[in-house]
C-alpha cells in the first residue's frame, strides 16, 4: 500500500549536469536555495525507510525524549517544520528535490518493503490494536528496536535504517534498510520474520502472506489509531468504490531502486510501468474475498483501478518525449491533497491541490506556504503502479510467502540495475501502445499470464523477461539469480500462485478458505 512511505535521508543539490537532461540543467543544479540541511546528506546517508525519514533526525524540530529504547515523537510524520527553507518554495525547488535522488552506480541500493496480515491462530480473526501494541512492545524489548509513538499509542518500531509500521487495517509492514545485494535483502526479511514469529507465537498470533484479506469483511477489520487515516477514510468513498478495501484489506511487496540521472530515471520508469502487469501476474496471490473466490487472481491489483483515478494508474505521460522530473512535479502538483500537518494535528485538505498550496491559496490553511516536509508527505499520497520520489518504487505485486518476498526485488534488480537487460526491455516494449499497456493493466488481475497479447499470451513475454532478469543478475556477479527460482515454475507453467490456491480451494480444502491461513503462514 505504501501509505506511509517517506523518503529517508536528507537531500542535496547535485552538481550541475549530474542529474539532468537538456533544458533542465539550470533547474536541477540551482533549484534548492538557502537550506542548511542540504549539507547533512553526508552526515545521515540515504535511506528508503518509510517511518521517520529525515524529519526525525533533525533534532531542532522534533520534540522527543528517549527512555530505554523508546523514541517518542509527536505523531507520524513527526513534525511539519523539519526542513525549513528561508524563502518560499518554488516549482523549481520541487523539481530539484526529485533530482537530488540521483546517485552514482556504486551507491545504488535495494530497499524492500512488505506487508502481512496478523491473525489470531485460534479464531483466524484479524489482530486488534491492543494485540498489535503488545506485539510491537515485545519485539522492541526482546530485539532492541526503538518504539515510535503517536501520542500515547505505539504505532511502529525503528532499528537503524529499518522500520516497522502499521497500515490502516493493522497490516504489519517491514520497510527494509537500503542494502547492496539481494542476499542482504533476503537475510533481512528472514531476520524480521523470525523476530515477529518469536513474539507472536507466544501470543497465539500468526501472520499470513497474501495480497487480499481472504475471509473477513471490511467491517471486521480494526482501524489503527493514526490521525491521517481518519481523513483518508472519509475521503475514499467520494472518489471510488474500493478505496476503503485498499486501506484495510490489501498487502503488497515492493522494491525501491535508484537512478543515476534524469535520463536513467526515465528509462527505468518506462520499463517499470510497461512490465508492471507481468510482475502483477507472476506474484498474483489474492483470489479470495469473504471466504469465496472473487473472480480475480489479483484482487489487490484490481482494487487500485477503482480507488481514486486522480492518484493511481499507468501514467501514460511518462512515455511522452517531454517527460522528466519537471513533468512529474506538474502531475503531482495537481493531484488532490489529503492533509497538511500543523501543530501536532492533521488538517483535512482533501480536494485541494499542492499547486494552490505553493501559491499560498490553500483553503484549509489560508495564507500558509508549504515546506519540503509537506511536499514529501504529499508525494507519499500518490499511488501509481510505479511511483517517483527520490527513487523509483515498483508497486504492482501482491504480498506472499517469504521466498516471493525475496524474488520480487530480484526480478526488478535484474531488469533495471543491468544496462543490457534494461535496454533489452526498452527495445521489447518500445512499440507497445498506451492502449495495450492499459489493457494489460486491467486484464492481468483477472487472467494472469493467460492474458492474450498480440499473437500469443502474456506468458510468452514473461518467459523472455524472466530470462533477461536472470541474465542481469548473473552479470551483477553476486550469485543472486537463485532468488528467481520462486517464480521459475510460474513462468514455465503459466499458472500463477492464485490459481494454485484456487485449485486447492476446489480440491483438498473442500471449498473453504480457512486452510489458506496455514498454507501461507509465515
From Swiss-Prot:
Disruption phenotype: Plants are characterized by a recessive embryo-lethal phenotype. Changing residue 22 to T: In strain: cv. Landsberg erecta and cv. Sha. It comes from the Eukaryota. Changing residue 48 to N: In strain: cv. Landsberg erecta. InterPro entries: GCL_bact_plant (IPR035434), GCS2 (IPR006336), Gln_synth/guanido_kin_cat_dom (IPR014746), Glut_cys_lig_pln_type (IPR011556). It catalyses: L-cysteine + L-glutamate + ATP = gamma-L-glutamyl-L-cysteine + ADP + phosphate + H(+). Homodimer or monomer when oxidized or reduced, respectively. PANTHER family: GLUTAMATE--CYSTEINE LIGASE, CHLOROPLASTIC. Belongs to the carboxylate-amine ligase family. Glutamate--cysteine ligase type 2 subfamily. This is Glutamate--cysteine ligase, chloroplastic. It comes from Arabidopsis thaliana.
Amino acid at each position: 500500500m505504501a501509505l506511509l512511505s517517506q523518503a529517508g535521508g536528507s537531500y542535496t543539490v547535485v552538481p550541475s549536469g549530474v542529474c539532468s537532461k537538456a533544458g533542465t540543467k539550470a533547474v536541477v543544479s540551482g533549484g534548492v536555495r538557502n537550506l542548511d540541511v542540504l549539507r547533512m546528506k553526508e552526515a545521515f546517508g540515504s535511506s528508503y525507510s518509510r517511518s521517520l525519514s529525515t524529519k526525525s533526525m533533525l533534532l531542532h524540530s522534533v520534540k522527543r525524549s528517549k527512555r530505554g529504547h523508546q523514541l517518542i515523537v509527536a505523531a507520524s510524520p513527526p513534525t511539519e517544520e523539519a526542513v525549513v527553507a528561508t524563502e518560499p518554495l518554488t516549482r523549481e525547488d520541487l523539481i530539484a528535490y526529485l533530482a537530488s535522488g540521483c546517485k552514482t552506480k556504486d551507491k545504488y541500493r535495494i530497499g524492500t518493503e512488505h506487508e502481512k496480515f496478523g491473525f489470531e491462530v485460534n479464531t483466524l480473526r484479524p489482530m486488534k490494536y491492543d494485540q498489535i501494541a503488545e506485539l510491537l512492545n515485545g519485539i522492541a524489548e526482546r530485539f532492541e528496536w526503538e518504539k515510535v509513538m503517536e501520542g500515547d499509542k505505539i504505532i511502529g518500531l525503528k532499528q537503524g535504517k529499518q522500520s516497522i509500521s502499521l497500515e490502516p487495517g493493522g497490516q504489519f509492514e517491514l520497510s527494509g534498510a537500503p542494502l547492496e545485494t539481494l542476499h542482504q535483502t533476503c537475510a533481512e526479511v528472514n531476520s524480521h520474520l523470525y523476530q515477529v514469529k518469536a513474539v507472536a507465537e507466544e501470543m497465539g498470533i500468526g501472520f499470513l502472506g497474501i495480497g487480499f484479506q481472504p475471509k473477513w469483511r471490511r467491517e471486521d477489520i480494526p482501524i489503527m489509531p493514526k490521525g491521517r487515516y481518519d481523513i483518508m477514510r472519509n475521503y475514499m468513498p467520494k472518489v471510488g468504490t474500493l478505496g476503503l478495501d485498499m486501506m484495510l484489506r490489501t498487502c503488497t511487496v515492493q522494491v525501491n531502486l535508484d537512478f543515476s540521472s534524469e535520463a536513467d530515471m526515465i528509462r527505468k520508469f518506462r520499463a517499470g510501468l510497461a512490465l508492471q502487469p507481468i510482475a502483477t501476474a507472476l506474484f498474483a496471490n489474492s483470489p479470495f474475498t469473504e471466504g469465496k473466490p472473487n473472480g480475480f487472481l489479483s484482487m489487490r491489483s484490481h482494487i487500485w483501478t477503482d480507488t481514486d483515478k486522480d492518484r493511481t494508474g499507468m501514467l501514460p505521460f511518462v512515455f511522452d518525449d517531454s517527460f522528466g522530473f519537471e513533468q512529474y512535479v506538474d502531475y503531482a502538483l495537481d493531484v488532490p491533497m489529503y492533509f497538511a500537518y500543523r501543530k501536532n494535528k492533521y488538517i483535512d485538505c482533501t480536494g485541494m491541490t499542492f499547486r494552490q498550496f505553493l501559491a499560498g491559496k490553500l483553503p484549509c490553511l489560508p495564507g500558509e506556504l508549504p515546506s519540503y516536509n509537506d511536499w514529501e508527505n504529499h508525494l507519499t499520497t500518490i499511488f501509481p503502479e510505479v511511483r517517483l520520489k527520490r527513487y523509483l518504487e515498483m508497486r504492482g505485486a501482491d504480498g506472499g510467502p517469504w521466498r516471493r518476498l525475496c524474488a520480487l526485488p530480484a526480478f526488478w534488480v535484474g531488469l533495471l540495475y543491468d544496462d543490457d537487460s534494461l535496454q533489452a526491455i526498452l527495445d521489447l516494449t518500445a512499440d507497445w501502445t498506451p492502449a495495450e499497456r492499459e489493457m494489460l493493466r486491467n486484464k492481468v488481475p483477472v487472467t494472469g499470464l493467460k492474458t492474450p497479447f498480440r499473437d500469443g499470451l502474456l506468458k510468452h513475454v514473461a518467459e523472455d523477461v524472466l530470462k533477461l532478469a536472470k541474465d542481469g543478475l548473473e552479470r551483477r556477479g553476486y550469485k543472486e539469480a537463485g532468488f528467481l527460482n520462486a517464480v521459475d515454475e510460474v513462468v514455465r507453467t503459466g499458472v500463477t500462485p492464485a490459481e494454485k490456491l484456487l485449485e486447492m480451494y476446489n480440491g483438498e480444502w473442500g471449498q473453504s478458505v480457512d486452510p489458506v491461513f496455514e498454507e501461507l503462514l509465515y
